[in-house]
Amino acid sequence: MKVAVVGATGLVGTRMLEVLAERNFPVTELLPVASAKSVGRKITFQGKEWTVVSAEDAIAARPDLALFSAGGSTSAELAPKFAEVGCRVVDNSSHWRMDPTKKLVVPEVNGDVIEADDYIIANPNCSTIQMLLPLWPLHKAYTIKRVVVSTYQSVTGTGYKAMDQMTAERAGGKWGEYDAVYPHPIDQNILPHIDSFLETGYTKEEMKMVNETHKIFGDDSIGVSPTTVRVPVQGGHSESINLEFEKEFTLEDVRKMMEETPGVTLQDDPANNVYPMPLYAWGKNDVFVGRIRRDPSVKSGLNFWCVADNLRKGAATNAVQIAEKLIEKGFLPKE
């Protein structure tokens, strides 16, 4: 299969290449696409060197699949051009997510919604993906009335420049002496501010979690109240999740569901200091769930903690899994 990776030299793009290789995705020809300054560079994939090409050259090569992680404006401009030549596009930006004509997919949750005429498919927000994967079996069993979620999001979600800012601060750099992508220092700090603020007081990141939950679950009645926070870690995103159900549940059944849910790993033995942590989620594809306990303030309430590598399941892995679903449905060649 001829595969283009748009944004191949970025944080998520490099993870996409890693995941394609690790999962033995049937790539016979790779078209790494990046900005003009990177065209001509060599990258290594599956032991072979490939040359970074322009988007125009990649489109002319008529790939079967294009994985996009190059920002919303790039996706808005280029995704339709790839689709016009018969290429299936999986886009990691926010541009297409709430477009009513485009599918927003977490394969383990709603992969079956993909149809033959879906040439541009949206990858959800990283924090939404890791929340909804464990929520889906719980919603099917007990019907979620309300979700209250607070996120603790890695600087890797912002990209290389955010990592550089944190590194400079940890080396003793003073504010104003280094390039900063955040409005305040991030090292030894926490910023309750991801993306821009809206008139409601919520941020765009928070509203992504609300709107994407409704679209993926196909249920606008679920109450979602998020607070998204940037923290000075690199391993992945963490979330404190509080749920209120329509139906009663047992903790034993909840734990069993988490053990049996594909893509979820249960780490819930706090007496022995076993619980999910971003340091140990780094580089892994699963969503890790623990600290499962009742919320005593409501009749059918549940609290838990979940962690995932935002560059993996929160982005690259989910995108490749969507492509695998396209193969499974016969919409992409098997080789």
Residue ranges and their predicted role:
Residues 66, 155-335:
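Charged docking surfaces used in two-component/phosphorelay signaling
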Residues 1-186, 221-223, 287-288, 292-297, ...:
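N-terminal Rossmann-like NAD(P) cofactor-binding subdomain of oxidoreductases
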